[in-house]
Amino acid sequence: MSDINQIEFSEISKKDELKSIIESLLFVSGEPLALKDICRIVEEDFKYVEDLMRELMNIYNGDSSRGIKIISLNGTYQLVTKTKNSEYIQKLLKKNVRQSLSQASLESLAIICYKQPITRVEIDEIRGVKSESAIQRLVEKNLVEETGRLEVPGRPILYGTTDEFLRHFALNDLGDLPSIELFEENNEVSDMVEE
């Protein structure tokens, strides 16, 4: 084998080994891993690991026969199950399908995701009814979190969506949300958010 072929083979082997290691890290972590942390663990250059992540994402996300995919959120990567299999995963975990969000929670979540950061009082005004319990449910489900406080008397809490919200709805970032114009046929929702 020539020296050039030997080097190419060595590079391919190293690349495959690193992909395997990164795949293991994502699997074991269960949580999103920052690219800088992956680089530190595998002791490789940021750009090189970023390219490997892109290759891994293409492999996982491009193969419809796989039940898992790699998502990227705010500079982190996570191995997750594909949403098309959620019905079966719920059966395995014996989750109650009735754990869905109430109409009030869905309305509040829609307002928060399009108007964030926003206070509870502003949500109440848009909905026309109190939203405290709906917001509390969203916080419990880790779809919404306190993002700060408004600098006015009383310093009301500002709410915004979480990374869990993005994962739950298979979004990379808030820019992936459907345009509010798409909801104009459903005047109730668009009227609430546009107010």
From Swiss-Prot:
InterPro entries per the UniProt record, alphabetical: ScpB_csome_segregation (IPR005234), WH-like_DNA-bd_sf (IPR036388), WH_DNA-bd_sf (IPR036390)
Record bears the keyword rRNA-binding: no
Gene3D superfamilies attached to this UniProt entry: Winged helix-like DNA-binding domain superfamily/Winged helix DNA-binding domain
Key words of the record: Cell cycle, Cell division, Chromosome partition, Cytoplasm
GO terms of biological process kind: cell division; chromosome separation; DNA replication
Compartments, record wording: Cytoplasm
GO cellular component, one term: cytoplasm
The keyword Secreted is assigned to this record: no
Signal peptide positions (record): none
SUPFAM superfamilies: Winged helix' DNA-binding domain (SSF46785)
Transmembrane annotation, as ranges: none
Assembly with partners or alone: Homodimer. Homodimerization may be required to stabilize the binding of ScpA to the Smc head domains. Component of a cohesin-like complex composed of ScpA, ScpB and the Smc homodimer, in which ScpA and ScpB bind to the head domain of Smc. The presence of the three proteins is required for the association of the complex with DNA.
Function according to Swiss-Prot or TrEMBL: Participates in chromosomal partition during cell division. May act via the formation of a condensin-like complex containing Smc and ScpA that pull DNA away from mid-cell into both cell halves.
Family according to the record: Belongs to the ScpB family.
Protein name: Segregation and condensation protein B
Source organism per UniProt: Clostridium perfringens (strain SM101 / Type A)
Lineage summary: Bacteria, Bacillati, Bacillota, Clostridia, Eubacteriales
Protein's gene: scpB
